[in-house]
Structure formats: structure tokens, C-alpha cells
């Protein structure tokens, strides 16, 4: 990281210990914020507003930033699996890593009911379900390699089918708790555990983006 970036982050960093959430990009943050409104409604606004953007799958950046934090800080870094089947980085003291079981966080938005509610699709329109049945993997190994970003892209198959881009954050908000995949519940379980270890005053930790 350039020296100027380190200085900027140091100026913004609070002196007291804090809980820091690291995510790959703004889209990840918006999806997590939507899920958090359902799973962590009292903590979502502060925590997700102040999540640190890494600018891609860059666990080393999270470690570098976290090492410069105040003693006693805790953190969770949430990463896509991408194409690496063994992608779980080594934990750093106080900083945990969570890697999605599927290739991308967007994979967990491919819930027909949530997409239908988010787009207010008429009940007589069954094109969505037919397309997902044809496109989606049948087993976990298939999901680990499946490119959900392609399917959900602004000009991807679903957008062309439905005649409009898919609003990913709205789909995340429309996903009911019992529709969320076990991986999502596991990640939020890790998040709750970390938050319980910190006083409430330390939830906010505006740190800027590491882009």
C-alpha cells in the first residue's frame, strides 16, 4: 500500500479498539447490509456503513490494515471463493476470515421466490423458474465453480429474459430468513460472535476504502 494511503488510514483510525468488517467491494457490502437488516437489525446500519472495502479478493490488505489497528480490536474479513478451492487464508490474531462455500456471494441471491418478490413478477410468469432449473448446478461441487455473476449481470441471461437488470440488493432484502443458505447463516453467526466480544460503542469504525 502506498505511504500516502497508510497515512490517510492512520488519520482516520480511531484510537480505541473496534470491530472491523472487511469486504471485497461495494456490491458485497450492499448485499450483506440487506441480509443484516433481517438477521442483525439493531447493528446493521453502523456495521455495514463502516465496512472496509478491499478492492477485490485481497486478504493481505485486510491483514496489513488490521495490524495497524488499536490493541484489542477484532475483525472479520468476508471473501469470495473465486476459482480457488482451498481459498481460506490463515487467521491473524484478532482477525478471522470467512470464505463463501460457493464461488461468489451473488450465488446466494439465486432464490426464485426472492427474485420474484423483488421484481414483482406475475404469478403466471414461470420463465424464471424454468431458466434457473436449467442453469443452476445440482450439487455442492457444481456451486463451487458456478459463475453466478454471469447469470446475474446487467446484460446476462436473466436480465435478457426478464427485460431489465436485476436489483441485487433488493433481491437480498426480499430473501426471507428461511430462504437464506446455511453459508449465510454461518457467516452471520461468526459476525455475531465477534460483535458480542466488543462493547457496543466500538461497532462504528469508519476506516475508508483500501482501493
What are these regions (language model features)?
Residues 1-211:
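Acidic, divalent-metal-binding catalytic cores of TOPRIM
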Amino acid at each position: 500500500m502506498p505511504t500516502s494511503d497508510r497515512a490517510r488510514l492512520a488519520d482516520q483510525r480511531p484510537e480505541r479498539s473496534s470491530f472491523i468488517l472487511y469486504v471485497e467491494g461495494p456490491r458485497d457490502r450492499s448485499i450483506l447490509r440487506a441480509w443484516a437488516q433481517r438477521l442483525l437489525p439493531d447493528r446493521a446500519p453502523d456495521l455495514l456503513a463502516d465496512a472496509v472495502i478491499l478492492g477485490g479478493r485481497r486478504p493481505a490488505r485486510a491483514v496489513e490494515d488490521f495490524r495497524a489497528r488499536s490493541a484489542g480490536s477484532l475483525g472479520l474479513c468476508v471473501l469470495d471463493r473465486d476459482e480457488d478451492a482451498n481459498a481460506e487464508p490463515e487467521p491473524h490474531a484478532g482477525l478471522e476470515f470467512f470464505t463463501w462455500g460457493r464461488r461468489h456471494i451473488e450465488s446466494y441471491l439465486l432464490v426464485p421466490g426472492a427474485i420474484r418478490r423483488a421484481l414483482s413478477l406475475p404469478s403466471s410468469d414461470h420463465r424464471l423458474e424454468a431458466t434457473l432449473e436449467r442453469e443452476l448446478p445440482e450439487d455442492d461441487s457444481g456451486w463451487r465453480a458456478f459463475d453466478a455473476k454471469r447469470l446475474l449481470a446487467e446484460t446476462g441471461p436473466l436480465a435478457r429474459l426478464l427485460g431489465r437488470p436485476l436489483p441485487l440488493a433488493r433481491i437480498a432484502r426480499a430473501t426471507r430468513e428461511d430462504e437464506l443458505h446455511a453459508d449465510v447463516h454461518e457467516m452471520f453467526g461468526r459476525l455475531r460472535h465477534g460483535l458480542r466480544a466488543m462493547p457496543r460503542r466500538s461497532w462504528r469504525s469508519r476506516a475508508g476504502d483500501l482501493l
